[in-house]
Amino acid sequence: MTSQGNKRTTKEGFGDLRFQNVSLLKNRSWPSLSSAKGRCRAVLEPLPDHRRNLAGVPGGEKCNSNNDYEDPEFQLLKAWPSMKILPARPIQESEYADTRYFQDTMEAPLLLPPKASVSTERQTRDVRMTHLEEVDKPTFKDVRSQRFKGFKYTKINKTPLPPPRPAITLPKKYQPLPPAPPEESSAYFAPKPTFPEVQRGPRQRSAKDFSRVLGAEEESHHQTKPESSCPSSNQNTQKSPPAIASSSYMPGKHSIQARDHTGSMQHCPAQRCQAAASHSPRMLPYENTNSEKPDPTKPDEKDVWQNEWYIGEYSRQAVEDVLMKENKDGTFLVRDCSTKSKAEPYVLVVFYGNKVYNVKIRFLESNQQFALGTGLRGNEMFDSVEDIIEHYTYFPILLIDGKDKAARRKQCYLTQPLPLARLLLTQYSSQALHE
């Protein structure tokens, strides 16, 4: 009866487990059978309703073996409703990119089992790999990230590390070059020529030309004059810019010397050569005159000569007589001043009200501009004489009689220049000479 009761109890225990849909946990206790005694141990299975299912033996007997045994997971299930899930731990400093190479030394004691003894770095990596494969999937985010990063780091460590960097030294291409010798630096990097160097160039060339001309004339005529070198220098000055040509004769107030093949010295008077150089700019073509800068202390006469109202150097009486014969208000002319000074180069002659007015045109050297009148009642400045004439064709000019200062001031527009002014003045001058 006892053996049959035991067998029945085991079957009923299995039947109870079949009808209950309970997922068995890992650490479960199965009944252990004892063939010698013929008894069975009670099957202890944790149920969702936290009640133990014990099979009854017929006759009111129970299996009294291991009745005091309690499963540790059964206690864990009782405490499960009171458990709380804490927030994720903060990311450790070793998980940043700049400290990933130190992760092995910082996390290895946490991931390895406590009984593991690591002697070298290679053994640490092997134990870590095997431990990661055995552990189940974690639930927390930080644990998952640690596993992923640790696995990735082990893969990276399998590749050979690059050799250590050598000591920091400047490469040859960045090292400073030794200083070049002064002769080579002056030969390849010559400074820009200045004005004194430009002056020395024509003097050297002119001396060579003098020697060539003198040598050729000695072979042909066997007699040369001291003045023969001056025309050759004049030809050279025509080819060179006028500023350089004039400077070639200025340094020395001494006479220019040239050596011939026999070693004799031929002297050329400096005054004659300077005179030839002074006339050379007028003989130059128009291309070379562009390089010459106008004299800042002398007004430009070329712009004035191109206008029909400029007559040049004539006497005051001759111009006034011609304007009186014309007898038209607003008729005007521009002539050279009789004083021939740089401060007052021109005179504006205007006919108005049966009178002829002579107004001086001043040149201001400080700002290189022109002004009309004495400047006592205004000092309006212009860039050229043409600007003065154009301005007073649209605005009236104030005319004051110097002899009669109490007279009424008059205003007049410049209407027209005197027609055929030069022809009339030449006729007037020829008649005056015959008389």
Curated annotation (Swiss-Prot):
Tyrosine-phosphorylated upon BCR cross-linking. Tyrosine phosphorylation at both Tyr-69 and Tyr-96 are required for BCR-induced calcium response and are essential to restore PLCG2-mediated signaling in BLNK-deficient DT40 cells, but this phosphorylation is dispensable in cells expressing LAT. Interacts with the SH2 domain of PLCG1 via phosphorylated Tyr-96. Tyrosine phosphorylation is increased when complexed with SKAP1 and FYB1. One of its GO terms (cellular component) is protein-containing complex. When phosphorylated, interacts with PLCG1, PLCG2, GRB2, VAV and LAT. Associated with a tyrosine-phosphorylated polypeptide (p92) in response to immunoreceptor stimulation. Interacts with LBR and AGO2. Interacts with FGR. Part of a complex consisting of CLNK, SKAP1 and FYB1. Interacts (via SH2 domain) with FYB1; this interaction allows SKAP1 and FYB1 to promote tyrosine phosphorylation of CLNK by LYN. Interacts (via SH2 domain) with MAP4K1. Residues 290-303 have a biased composition (Basic and acidic residues). It comes from Mus musculus (Mouse). The N-terminal proline-rich region interacts with the SH3 domain of PLCG1. The modification Phosphotyrosine is found at Y69, Y96. An adapter protein which plays a role in the regulation of immunoreceptor signaling, including PLC-gamma-mediated B-cell antigen receptor (BCR) signaling and FC-epsilon R1-mediated mast cell degranulation. Together with FGR, it acts as a negative regulator of natural killer cell-activating receptors and inhibits interferon-gamma production. Acts as a positive regulator of both T-cell receptor and natural killer T (NKT) cell receptor signaling in CD4-positive NKT cells. Together with MAP4K1, it enhances CD3-triggered activation of T-cells and subsequent IL2 production. This is Cytokine-dependent hematopoietic cell linker. Residues 178-182 are annotated as: Mediates interaction with LAT, GRB2, and FGR.
